[in-house]
Structures are given as structure tokens and as C-alpha cells.
């Protein structure tokens, strides 16, 4: 029986990917459809993807599939054909091609079975996820942006909104999608008579969010087809003004795609204009935050003097300090004061 998971170290895989001479294409896609046996589907897809040298992150659940991957350019069309013929529900599926791509977005293939393909926290048996809002294409998005009766809702996390968003879009401040859904309903009650336009990176979150809003009594709900990625691509192809400002955050090694020239965020350490996310170089912290080149040099890629000092310790001492330390997904959140004035490690209990 073939091995259906990776057995090579991350360092070795990353070095191998960086040494590759063939360009790669970064692709994202999702589909809500019923998968009777997610584990069986996962194992079959794993063999298809590994045969094509696909890297990336793929989640499967009874409700569908969610994938962010990179494919060797010479194998993109073969990948497309094999994906489309794998299951009738995937035939003709829209593939979002990265807007900015150095081909180094992923270096390992990870495929996991989960309860949901996007964690929504919804526990309501009467919720119909298929009753979604209407799609908006790029030209229609620009029309809606000029409609005083329309409200644009950003269904991404606060750190994504911070570096880029549509003009006058409403932020639903939260660290996770599951936190956003109830907040969105609460915040939009006063706009119940408006046209609600929801968007996210590639469409998966705003599609489900549009169904959740309709479930909660909102009748005029739209969502942007293919999210920010598809909107920007189609607007450029059609010669339309691109109304998204700043950078589109992405969940891979690139950390972002430049959409417009404006830099609307600031370094979390000195306040200089900057929209480049990074993870604290101290493995015992790994905080996600925005850091300008000057502060990266000053703090050696760390989020604080404390982490700088820890990074300078012998590796054995660093490992000892990391042992038993809570180190989940930590994110700098200015609005909630997750860090103190010295930008030390946030309280993991928060």
C-alpha cells in the first residue's frame, strides 16, 4: 500500500523546493458538495496530487473541499483535467490563479480531514448552507461600490483587513471566521434594508457567510465571485478600475499579493508605513505581525527585545524554554491590545 503522508523533514523539503528549476503556479479552489467518505476521498486525491508533484494545504470534510496548492507549470493542465474528472461535482470548478507568484508558496503537501472545510462554529440544524447570496462579477462589484444603498462587508480576519480592503468596506473585527459570523449579524441589523455585499480572499468564507446572513433574515445579500483574487484578475483583464486598496493577505509563504500601490498599514513596532507580515523569528513565539525592514534589522526579525534576547541563546536553552510553552496561532491585534507597549509575547490565555 502506498504511503499516504509525508515522511521527509520540513527543512529538507523546503531546501528541495527552493532548488527546483521549474516554475510553479499557485492555485486555490474550493467546493461545497457532499463527500460521503472524506477519508477515502482524501487518500485517493493524495495519490493523484503526489503523482503530479503538487504541494500545498488541502482540507476535506463531508461538506466539501478547500485547497491552496502549488503545481509545476508543465503539469497545470494535467492537474486541471484530473481534478475535473475525479468527481462530477468538481467538473469545471473555478481555479483561482495567484495574482503575484514566485512559485515558492508551499514545499510540502498536507491533506487533512476535518469537521468543516472552514471553521464556522455554526451549530444550527436548520441552517441551509446551500441557500447562498447572489454572485457579483467584477463589473457589478464596481457598480455596487458606487451604490449608496450597498454596504460592503469584509469577511476576513482583522490582520487581513489591516493591509488591504475595498473602499469603505466595513470590518467585522475578529481573529477568526467563527467569531465573525455572529458579530456580522449583530453589526448589520441597522443595515437590514441595505444591499449587503460580502467578500473574502477566494470566496469560501463569504459564500458561507452570505447563507448565514440569509438564514438570519437578511434578504438582499450578494457575495463576490471568486473573492478578491478573481475580482482583481477580471478587473485587470477587462480594463476596469481596481477598487481594492492595498495588499491581499494570503495564507502561504508569500503572506500577501500586491493589488494597488497604496500602503495603508503601519509597522507594529515603529509606526512607519508598511504592509509586510512576518512571523517572529523566535520559534518560541512565532507571532504574526507587521514589520518594516528597519525594525527587522533592529530586532533581528523578532517582535520584541525579549524575543531578540531569547533568539541569541544557545539552541539547547531555547528548546528548554519552549518546552511546555503554549504556542498556538498568535496574532498581533492592535484593536484588542494583544501586546503591551514593548511588544512582548501576548498572553496565551486571551
From Swiss-Prot:
Keyword tRNA processing in annotation: yes
Protein name per its UniProtKB record: tRNA uridine(34) hydroxylase
Residues in Rhodanese domain copies: 146-240
UniProt GO MF annotations: oxidoreductase activity, acting on paired donors, with incorporation or reduction of molecular oxygen
This protein's UniProt keywords: Oxidoreductase, tRNA processing
Purpose of the protein: Catalyzes oxygen-dependent 5-hydroxyuridine (ho5U) modification at position 34 in tRNAs.
Active site residues per record: 200
Domain of life (superkingdom): Bacteria
Record bears the keyword tRNA processing: yes
Region (Disordered): 319-350
Organism lineage string: Bacteria, Pseudomonadati, Pseudomonadota, Gammaproteobacteria, Enterobacterales
Xref: HAMAP family: TrhO
Family indicated by similarity: Belongs to the TrhO family.
Organism: Salmonella agona (strain SL483)
Gene responsible for this protein: trhO
Amino acid at each position: 500500500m502506498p504511503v499516504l503522508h509525508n515522511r521527509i523533514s520540513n527543512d529538507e523539503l523546503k531546501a528541495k523546493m527552493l532548488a527546483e528549476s521549474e516554475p510553479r503556479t499557485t492555485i486555490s479552489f474550493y467546493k461545497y458538495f457532499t463527500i460521503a467518505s472524506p477519508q477515502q476521498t482524501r487518500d485517493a486525491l493524495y495519490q493523484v496530487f503526489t503523482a503530479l508533484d503538487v504541494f500545498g494545504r488541502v482540507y476535506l470534510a463531508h461538506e466539501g473541499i478547500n485547497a491552496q496548492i502549488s503545481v509545476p507549470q508543465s503539469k497545470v493542465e494535467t492537474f486541471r483535467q484530473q481534478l475535473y474528472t475525479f468527481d462530477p461535482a468538481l467538473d469545471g470548478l473555478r481555479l483561482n490563479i495567484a495574482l503575484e507568484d514566485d512559485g515558492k508558496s508551499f514545499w510540502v503537501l498536507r491533506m487533512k480531514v476535518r469537521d468543516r472545510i472552514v471553521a464556522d462554529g455554526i451549530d444550527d440544524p436548520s441552517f441551509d448552507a446551500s441557500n447562498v447570496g447572489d454572485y457579483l462579477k467584477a463589473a457589478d462589484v464596481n457598480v455596487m461600490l458606487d451604490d449608496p444603498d450597498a454596504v460592503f462587508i469584509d469577511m476576513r480576519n482583522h490582520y487581513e483587513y489591516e493591509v488591504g480592503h475595498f473602499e469603505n468596506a466595513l470590518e467585522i473585527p475578529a481573529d477568526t471566521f467563527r467569531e465573525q459570523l455572529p458579530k456580522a449579524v449583530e453589526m448589520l441589523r441597522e443595515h437590514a434594508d441595505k444591499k449587503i455585499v460580502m467578500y473574502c480572499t477566494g470566496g469560501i468564507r463569504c459564500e458561507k457567510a452570505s447563507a448565514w446572513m440569509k438564514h438570519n433574515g437578511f434578504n438582499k445579500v450578494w457575495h463576490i465571485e471568486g473573492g478578491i483574487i478573481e475580482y482583481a484578475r477580471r478587473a485587470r483583464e477587462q480594463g476596469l478600475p481596481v477598487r481594492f486598496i492595498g495588499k491581499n493577505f494570503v495564507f502561504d509563504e508569500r503572506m500577501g499579493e500586491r493589488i494597488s500601490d497604496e500602503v495603508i498599514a503601519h509597522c507594529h513596532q515603529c509606526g512607519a508605513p508598511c504592509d509586510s507580515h512576518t512571523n517572529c523569528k523566535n520559534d518560541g513565539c512565532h507571532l504574526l505581525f507587521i514589520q518594516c525592514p528597519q525594525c527587522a534589522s533592529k530586532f533581528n526579525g523578532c517582535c520584541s527585545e525579549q524575543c531578540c534576547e531569547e533568539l541569541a541563546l544557545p539552541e539547547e536553552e531555547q528548546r528548554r524554554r519552549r518546552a511546555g510553552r503554549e504556542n498556538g496561532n498568535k496574532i498581533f491585534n492592535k484593536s484588542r491590545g494583544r501586546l503591551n507597549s514593548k511588544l512582548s509575547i501576548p498572553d496565551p490565555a486571551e
